[in-house]
Design a protein with these regions (language model features):
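Active-site loop segments of alpha/beta catalytic cores
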Residues: 2-47, 62-66, 70-294
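Active-site donor-binding segments of glycosyltransferases and PAPS-dependent sulfotransferases
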Residues: 53, 57, 66
Length: 294
């Protein structure tokens, strides 16, 4: 019989760079359509679908959506406690994503430059919401909160590094402080080239950076060399652009290089009907069994 590993504790050991028993794997994002197609037995039961995905794919880390009102209801009712055996991460959209939803992309960029009071008003509402969600997340035995704020593209930030430091970073620091006050780990997500802000994110209190966007030029091993054990990373595997052989080799390389921890291995894109393919089995060997359920 194989070694029984406590999923949550092993992830914590990895985040502390303290030699986990094995490198944890996980995914933060699962679309509803993906869950309904591959886990139809629990259609309409989001928590059970996530639990099934975690069990069948041997995930240690799973993400759950805390943005929608239906999810707030699940939080209030304590339903996410069903996932307590996993290192469960609730994701909350950050101030820039929420501003873009309310104002549009161009107007949000203008606000960052010229109308910071409007942005401040949006953030005030976000902070109140984050406090409530973090309190409930802890009661549901979640392990972490990820601030999801896509603020970069393939060529860098959508605004200047100076604007990030002066305007955006203080908000991120406040959110990290709220997360930590509830004894939760603080994760940060943004696609694109975020290299210029990682040092600032560490200083603001973030424990783990997702997703290590290889298509934007991020190199996991350069990041490891630069930041050492001061932060961890999650993701790294490009299941869209790499072939089976590349994925298998990248997995092996990461397992060899991160034996002391500092990495949660997973895809860079999450699971949707647009991102999954047969190549997924190179990252998650159990995928073939899940696919047969379709």
């Amino acid at each position: 019989m194989g070694e029984v590993v406590n999923q949550r504790e092993n992830v914590v050991v990895a985040l502390k760079h303290s030699s986990p028993s094995r490198l944890p794997r996980g995914e933060l994002f699962f679309t509803g359509k993906f869950l309904d197609i591959y886990f139809p037995d629990f259609q309409g039961n989001y928590v059970e679908q996530i639990a099934s995905a975690a069990y069948l794919l041997s995930l240690s880390v799973v993400g759950v959506d805390l943005n929608e009102e239906w999810s707030r209801s699940l939080l209030r009712e304590g339903n996410y406690g069903r996932l307590r055996e996993y290192f469960t991460v609730g994701y909350i959209n950050g101030p820039i994503m929420q501003a873009i939803t309310q104002l549009g992309f161009c107007q949000t960029m203008i606000c960052i430059k010229r109308d910071q009071q409007t942005l401040s008003n949006i953030v005030a509402g976000i902070l109140k919401d984050v406090k409530e969600k973090c309190r409930l997340a802890k009661k549901n035995d979640l392990s972490a909160i990820v601030l999801a704020d896509d603020i970069a593209g393939s060529h860098g930030l959508f605004f200047s590094p100076g604007d990030f430091t002066d305007i955006i970073l203080p908000y991120y620091a406040q959110i990290a402080e709220i997360i930590k006050a509830n004894d939760l780990y603080a994760f940060f997500h943004s696609d694109g080239d975020t290299r210029v802000i990682i040092e600032s994110l560490i200083g603001a209190g973030y424990d783990c950076i997702h997703p290590v966007d290889t298509q934007a030029g991020l190199d996991l091993y350069e990041l490891k060399k630069t930041f050492g054990n001061r932060v961890s990373f999650m993701g790294h595997i490009d299941i869209i652009n790499w072939d089976d052989g590349q994925i298998a080799q990248k997995v092996k390389d990461a397992e060899d290089a991160f034996k002391e921890g500092g990495l949660i291995l997973g895809s860079t894109c999450g699971f949707s009907m647009k991102t999954i393919s047969d190549r997924l089995h190179a990252l998650y060997p159990q995928w073939k069994g899940v696919k047969q359920r379709q």
